[in-house]
């Protein structure tokens, strides 16, 4: 379906050792309504990811790619893809997200109706189990010190609402107007991996825009394709990202004691989380 550039969507995919799902992801994006540009930023893949991307680029002039010689992180690569595109809408799509033909166009419709807005989808795994990261509230680290239950950021789906307002959606799939992305300065490149989506959603809300999930737009998210080979690396940057998020948004209003306690809570948890992640990959 041909869509004029005034409504065009740039689909931005960051790949790293993503060959397992990348071919399917890109083919679906090429078939998707509203997609005017596809930008793939490859962060130093050692598998067949680049060969897959090159094959799609030859077949479809809408697709261009940047092959980074190292891995500067997800946020940096997303910003690279946004800067290399020009149409009014930006969709950040993980290589393990498998969109349907109408997915991005429907998200754009919701974002237009709620303007300005950043919109995510109802993410499920291959068995139909919902991803709790699709609907989240902001972390409250002081509350986590009082109760471990506060660490659970997931928000239940509101089955009565086609569009559910939340604090944050998953960076695995999010769509927003380019002008809004540029107004907040894009992704914070101080994050290497994880929590950059929480950060972006918070800054979007801080400028008066909305963050929401289109509950009736379901997308399969095959989680963890790129991270299975390096579980300890992923956990390290996940915890580092949480500490950065706390430092930006919560630490300035907390006492020195609370800041020290949060630091200890995050980094004491890291070795246990890393061990669990490592054991999961060996099953």
Over which residues does each language-model region extend?
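A conserved acidic beta->alpha catalytic loop
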Residues: 42-51, 70
């Amino acid at each position: 379906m041909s869509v004029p550039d005034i409504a065009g969507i740039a689909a931005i995919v960051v790949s790293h050792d993503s060959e397992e799902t990348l071919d399917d992801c890109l083919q679906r994006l090429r078939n998707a309504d509203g997609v005017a540009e596809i930008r793939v930023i490859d962060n130093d893949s050692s598998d067949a990811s680049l060969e897959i991307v090159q094959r799609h680029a030859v077949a479809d002039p809408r697709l261009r790619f940047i092959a980074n010689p190292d891995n500067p992180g997800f946020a940096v690569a997303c910003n690279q893809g946004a800067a290399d595109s020009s149409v009014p809408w930006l969709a950040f799509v993980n290589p393990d997200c498998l969109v349907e033909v109408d997915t991005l166009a429907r998200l754009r419709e919701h974002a237009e109706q709620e303007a300005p807005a950043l919109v995510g989808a109802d993410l499920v795994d291959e068995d139909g189990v919902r991803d709790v990261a699709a609907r989240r509230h902001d972390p409250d680290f002081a509350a986590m010190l009082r109760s471990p239950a506060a660490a659970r950021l997931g928000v239940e789906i509101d089955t009565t609402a086609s569009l559910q307002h939340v604090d944050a959606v998953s960076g695995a799939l999010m769509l927003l107007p380019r002008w809004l992305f540029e107004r907040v300065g894009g992704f914070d490149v101080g994050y290497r991996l994880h929590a950059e989506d929480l950060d972006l959603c918070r800054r979007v809300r801080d400028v008066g825009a909305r963050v929401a999930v289109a509950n009736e737009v379901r997308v399969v998210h095959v989680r963890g394709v790129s991270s299975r080979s390096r579980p300890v690396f992923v956990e390290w940057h996940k915890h580092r990202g949480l500490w950065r998020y706390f430092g930006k948004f919560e630490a300035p209003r907390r006492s020195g004691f609370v800041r020290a306690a949060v630091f200890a809570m995050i980094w004491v948890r890291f070795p246990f989380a890393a061990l669990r992640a490592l054991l999961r990959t060996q099953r």
